[in-house]
C-alpha cells in the first residue's frame, strides 16, 4: 500500500492510450465519443483505487511507529514546492499589493461568480502579508479528539507561531491539552452563521468569545463562496467597531485555489480540502519548522481505544465533503520523511530524534 494512497488503476491519459492502441484507425460514433469523454472526466475527478479503511490505517501507523527525525532537506524541498505553486508569502491573505483597486477575482469555491475590488473592500486589506518571514517554529493545532488528555498544551505554547482551526474553545479545562497561545485562528463563515446568527441580532456574545484569542489574526475565506462574503465583512466591522485586539485577514481565493490544485495532483479528491490541510500547507511554506497536533480523523486512538471526534465534542462532519483519511495519509507521509512533525502520542512520552 502506498503511504499516500495515491496508487490509481486508471488515469485519463492511460485510458486514452488504451483506446488509441486498441482502435488505431477506428472512428467512434458520436454517442460513444461523448460517453468516453464523460467516463474519462469521471475517472479524473474520482480516480478508481481502494483507500485503506480506518482499521488498516491505524494498524499501519502502529506498525511504522511515531519516532521522528527532522529532515531539513525534505522540509526545504516541500517549502520550495509550496512557493512555486502557491506563493504563500505573498498570496496567503488579501493585501493592497496583491489585490489592487479595480482587480477582478473569481471566488475559488464557485464557478459562476467573480468580484471586483472597490474602495470599500480595498480599505480593509493590509499593505502586505503582516508576518515577519520566515516564521521560525510553528504549531498547527487541529481539533481532533486525540488531543484530549494528551498533555500537549505546554509544548504547543512553546512554538513561536501557533495556528488554530475554526474558533476552537480554549477555556481552562482544555489548556493543559491544547495550550492557550494563538497567533492565527481560522473562522469559517458557516461558524458565524451557526453559532452567532450571522451577527444580525447581537454582537456581544461573539465579541466575548473572541477575547480568548488575544491579539490573534482571524483568518476568513470571505471570497471563497459568495454566501461567505457578507458574514466575513460583518466579523471585520464588529471587531473594528469595539476596538478588539484581533485583526481580520481575508484569505486570497487564488491561494486557496492553488492549494486545492496542488493536493488534487497528489491524489486528494474531495469537494473541498479541510481547513486544517489549508493551514498546514501555508505553514509549510511560511515556517522553518512545523509541528501539527490534533490531526487524527479516526474514532480510536493509538491504543485503539474509542475517542471523540473533537477534543471538545463528538459532533461529526457532513459525510463526503472532505477526504480526511486521504489528507491524513499525505500528512503522515510528510511526517515519515521528516518534513513536518505529527504529534500523535501524549506529549510527556514524546520520542524525538536529532535533526538530520
UniProtKB/Swiss-Prot annotation:
GO terms for molecular function: alpha-N-acetylneuraminate alpha-2,8-sialyltransferase activity. The chain crosses the membrane at residues 30-48. It is a single-pass type II membrane protein. Residues 49-356 are lumenal. Disulfide bonds join 138-287. Pathway: Protein modification; protein glycosylation; Lipid metabolism; sphingolipid metabolism. Its EC number is 2.4.3.8. Glycans are attached at residues 71, 119, 214, 245. Keywords: Disulfide bond, Glycoprotein, Glycosyltransferase, Golgi apparatus, Lipid biosynthesis, Lipid metabolism, Membrane, Signal-anchor, Sphingolipid metabolism, Transferase, Transmembrane, Transmembrane helix. Residues 1-29 are cytoplasmic. GO terms for biological process: N-glycan processing; oligosaccharide metabolic process; protein glycosylation; sphingolipid metabolic process. InterPro entries: Glyco_trans_29 (IPR001675), Glycosyltr_29_Sialyltrsf (IPR050943), GT29-like_sf (IPR038578), Sialyl_trans (IPR012163). CMP-N-acetyl-beta-neuraminate binds at residues 143, 166, 274-276, 296, 310. It comes from the Eukaryota. It catalyses: an N-acetyl-alpha-neuraminyl-(2->3)-beta-D-galactosyl derivative + CMP-N-acetyl-beta-neuraminate = an N-acetyl-alpha-neuraminyl-(2->8)-N-acetyl-alpha-neuraminyl-(2->3)-beta-D-galactosyl derivative + CMP + H(+); a ganglioside GM3 (d18:1(4E)) + CMP-N-acetyl-beta-neuraminate = a ganglioside GD3 (d18:1(4E)) + CMP + H(+); a ganglioside GD3 (d18:1(4E)) + CMP-N-acetyl-beta-neuraminate = a ganglioside GT3 (d18:1(4E)) + CMP + H(+); a ganglioside GD1a (d18:1(4E)) + CMP-N-acetyl-beta-neuraminate = a ganglioside GT1a (d18:1(4E)) + CMP + H(+). Its main location: Golgi. GO terms for cellular component: Golgi membrane. Pfam families: Glyco_transf_29. Belongs to the glycosyltransferase 29 family. Catalyzes the addition of sialic acid in alpha 2,8-linkage to the sialic acid moiety of the ganglioside GM3 to form ganglioside GD3; gangliosides are a subfamily of complex glycosphingolipds that contain one or more residues of sialic acid. Can catalyze the addition of a second alpha-2,8- sialic acid to GD3 to form GT3. Can use GM1b, GD1a and GT1b as acceptor substrates to synthesize GD1c, GT1a and GQ1b respectively. This is Alpha-N-acetylneuraminide alpha-2,8-sialyltransferase. It comes from Bos taurus. The gene is ST8SIA1.
Amino acid at each position: 500500500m502506498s503511504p499516500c494512497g495515491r496508487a490509481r488503476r486508471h488515469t485519463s491519459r492511460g485510458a486514452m492510450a488504451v483506446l488509441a492502441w486498441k482502435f488505431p484507425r477506428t472512428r467512434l460514433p458520436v454517442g460513444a465519443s461523448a460517453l468516453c469523454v464523460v467516463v474519462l472526466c469521471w475517472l479524473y475527478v474520482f480516480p478508481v483505487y481502494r483507500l485503506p479503511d480506518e482499521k488498516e490505517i491505524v494498524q499501519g501507523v502502529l506498525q511504522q511507529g511515531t519516532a521522528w527525525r527532522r529532515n531539513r532537506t525534505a522540509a526545504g524541498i516541500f517549502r520550495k514546492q509550496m512557493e512555486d505553486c502557491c506563493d504563500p508569502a505573498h498570496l496567503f491573505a488579501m493585501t493592497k499589493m496583491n489585490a489592487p483597486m479595480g482587480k477582478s477575482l473569481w471566488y475559488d469555491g464557485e464557478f459562476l461568480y467573480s468580484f471586483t475590488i472597490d474602495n470599500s473592500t480595498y480599505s480593509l486589506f493590509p499593505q502586505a502579508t503582516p508576518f515577519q518571514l520566515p516564521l521560525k517554529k510553528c504549531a498547527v493545532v487541529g481539533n481532533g479528539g486525540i488531543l484530549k488528555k494528551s498533555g500537549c498544551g505546554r509544548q504547543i505554547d512553546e512554538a513561536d507561531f501557533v495556528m488554530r482551526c475554526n474558533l476552537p474553545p480554549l477555556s481552562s479545562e482544555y489548556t493543559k491539552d491544547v495550550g492557550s497561545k494563538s497567533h492565527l485562528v481560522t473562522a469559517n463563515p458557516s461558524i458565524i452563521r451557526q453559532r452567532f446568527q450571522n451577527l444580525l441580532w447581537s454582537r456581544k456574545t461573539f465579541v466575548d468569545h473572541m477575547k480568548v484569542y488575544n491579539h490573534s489574526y482571524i483568518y476568513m475565506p470571505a471570497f471563497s463562496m459568495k454566501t461567505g462574503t457578507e458574514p466575513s465583512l460583518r466579523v471585520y466591522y464588529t471587531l473594528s467597531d469595539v476596538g478588539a485586539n484581533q485583526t481580520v485577514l481575508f484569505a486570497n481565493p487564488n491561494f486557496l485555489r492553488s492549494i486545492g490544485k496542488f493536493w488534487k495532483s497528489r491524489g486528494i479528491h474531495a469537494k473541498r480540502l479541510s481547513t486544517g490541510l489549508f493551514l498546514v500547507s501555508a505553514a509549510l511554506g511560511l515556517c522553518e519548522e512545523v509541528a501539527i497536533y490534533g490531526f487524527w480523523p479516526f474514532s480510536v486512538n493509538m491504543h485503539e481505544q474509542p475517542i471523540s471526534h473533537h477534543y471538545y465534542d463528538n459532533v461529526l462532519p457532513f459525510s463526503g465533503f472532505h477526504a480526511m483519511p486521504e489528507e491524513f495519509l499525505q500528512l503522515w507521509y510528510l511526517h515519515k520523511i521528516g518534513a513536518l512533525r505529527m504529534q500523535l502520542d501524549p506529549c510527556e512520552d514524546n520520542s524525538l530524534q536529532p535533526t538530520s
